[in-house]
Structure formats: structure tokens, C-alpha cells
């Protein structure tokens, strides 16, 4: 393939994230810092997980259960880290609100909190794309492409970029769901995020079957779509509640 193809694969994986960054995140410095810190945090977590599993590699390609165990342990570790990330954010939010009270300035608005959660999720998604897609794209800039036997209809680099895009979407918007679930004590949202994460991870194992990507990738995008819809409904409801409370207090 050519340089254009390599850039195209990268844009498939991260193009929507770049658009979101330029249109929303780049306007506020604290959101940029949130994205950068979140990306670094999740990259470090993936490196730690890689180190923990290094003694057990290579895994046998014809046995699926070690990969399932890998997915389960990775999801559990990252979900625990997500909760710690929210705890740190909550402490910073309390500090900022206290400082705003001292200088007689308004506290963080609901939209600010939602955007911080969005930025944190975007950092998680970008870290996933960098680790699992962009790190593989160097050969894509060369004169040829690469196919794998179990997904012979689509180039390996393209399918990697498509899967990365799905995970970027899932991680970005599930972070918003999780932060609101933690803040409101909503057990449903607190549970649904790990379930979404685990389901998406398990669906990647379908690719081990012959032409499994034909089934696994659409199912992965179904999960991403449901995550996006649920997040949209939740945010809309929270904005309506906030507006009603503001109207009632006047």
C-alpha cells in the first residue's frame, strides 16, 4: 500500500476523535489536560497489563479460553482504574468548587462536568487506538498490504482500524455513563459500563473463527451504537433535570 493508505487507516481509527477534539475539547484548556492525563493513564495501564501477561505468552491460537481470561482480567483491572480515576476527578471537582466559592465565582456547571467525563473517555479511547491499532500501522505505509486467513476478505490494517473506531466510541461515551452513575449512585449505570466493556472485549474473540470478523465487527458496532444511544438519553435527561431545577429555583 502507500502512505495515503496508511494515513487513511489512521483516520478511520482516530478521525472522529480528532473532530471531537477540535470542535469541543480544544476550546477549554482543562479539557485538553484531562484528555492528555487520561490517555497517559490508560496507556500505562495497558503496558502494566502487557507486563503481567508477558510470562504466559505466546498463547495458543487454537485455544480460546486463555484469551477470554485475558479479556476478563484486563476489563476488571481497567474498570477498577476507571473508578479510581473518577475518585481523583471528584476530589479535584470539590477543590475547584471550594475555590470558586471563596472568590465568589460560579461552580462547575453540569455541562462542564459532562465535558470532563467526555474528555476522560476520549483519552481512554485514544489510548486503546494507539496501543491496538496505530502501533500496528507502520507496515501499512509500505508497498503491500496484509491479510489474515481468518478474515481474508478485508486487509488486516483496515479491520484493525475499524475495530479501534468501535472501541474509541465505546470508551468515550461509556466514561460519561460511568461518571454520572458514580456521581448519582445509579447502580444500573455503574453495572452497565463494565458489562459493555466486557461484552465488547469478548466479541473480539469471534474473530478467531473462520471469517469471524463478518459477524464480530457488526456486533461490536451494535454495542457501540447502544452505548452511544444510552449515553445520549442519559445526558438529555440530566440536562432537562438541571433546567427544571434552575427554573424552580428562580
Swiss-Prot record:
Gene Ontology biological-process annotations: Notch signaling pathway; protein processing
One GO cellular component term of this record is: membrane
User: What protein family does this chain belong to?
Assistant: Belongs to the APH-1 family.
Give the residue spans that cross the bilayer.
5-25, 29-49, 57-77, 116-136, 157-177, 191-211, 212-232
Q: What is this protein called?
A: Gamma-secretase subunit APH1-like
Record's subunit section: Probable component of the gamma-secretase complex, a complex composed of a presenilin homodimer, nicastrin, APH1 and PEN2.
Q: Does the keyword NADP apply?
A: no
Identify the Pfam families for this entry: Aph-1
Membrane as a keyword of this entry, yes or no, is yes
Function, as annotated: Probable subunit of the gamma-secretase complex, an endoprotease complex that catalyzes the intramembrane cleavage of integral proteins such as Notch receptors.
Keywords of the record, alphabetical order, are: Membrane, Notch signaling pathway, Transmembrane, Transmembrane helix
The record describes its membrane topology as: Multi-pass membrane protein
Protein location: Membrane
Which cysteine pairs are joined by S-S bonds? none
Q: Which InterPro entries match?
A: Aph-1
Domain of life (superkingdom): Eukaryota
Amino acid at each position: 500500500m502507500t502512505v495515503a493508505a496508511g494515513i487513511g487507516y489512521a483516520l478511520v481509527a482516530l478521525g472522529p476523535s480528532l473532530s471531537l477534539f477540535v470542535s469541543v475539547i480544544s476550546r477549554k484548556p482543562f479539557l485538553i489536560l484531562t484528555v492528555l492525563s487520561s490517555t497517559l493513564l490508560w496507556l500505562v495501564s495497558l503496558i502494566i497489563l502487557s507486563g503481567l501477561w508477558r510470562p504466559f505468552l505466546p498463547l495458543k491460537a487454537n485455544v480460546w479460553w486463555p484469551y477470554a481470561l485475558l479479556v476478563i482480567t484486563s476489563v476488571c483491572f481497567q474498570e477498577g482504574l476507571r473508578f479510581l480515576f473518577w475518585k481523583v476527578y471528584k476530589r479535584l471537582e470539590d477543590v475547584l468548587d471550594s475555590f470558586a466559592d471563596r472568590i465568589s465565582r460560579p461552580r462547575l456547571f453540569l455541562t462542564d462536568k459532562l465535558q470532563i467525563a467526555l474528555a476522560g473517555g476520549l483519552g481512554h479511547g485514544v489510548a486503546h487506538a494507539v496501543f491496538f491499532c496505530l502501533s500496528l500501522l507502520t507496515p501499512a505505509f509500505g508497498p503491500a498490504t496484509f491479510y489474515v486467513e481468518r478474515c481474508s476478505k478485508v486487509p488486516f490494517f483496515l479491520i484493525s482500524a475499524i475495530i479501534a473506531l468501535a472501541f474509541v466510541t465505546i470508551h468515550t461515551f461509556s466514561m460519561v455513563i460511568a461518571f454520572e452513575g458514580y456521581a448519582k449512585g445509579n447502580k444500573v449505570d455503574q453495572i452497565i459500563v463494565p458489562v459493555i466493556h466486557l461484552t465488547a472485549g469478548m466479541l473480539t474473540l469471534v474473530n478467531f473463527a473462520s471469517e469471524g470478523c463478518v459477524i464480530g465487527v457488526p456486533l461490536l458496532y451494535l454495542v457501540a451504537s447502544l452505548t452511544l444511544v444510552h449515553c445520549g438519553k442519559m445526558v438529555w435527561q440530566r440536562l432537562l433535570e438541571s433546567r427544571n431545577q434552575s427554573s424552580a429555583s428562580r
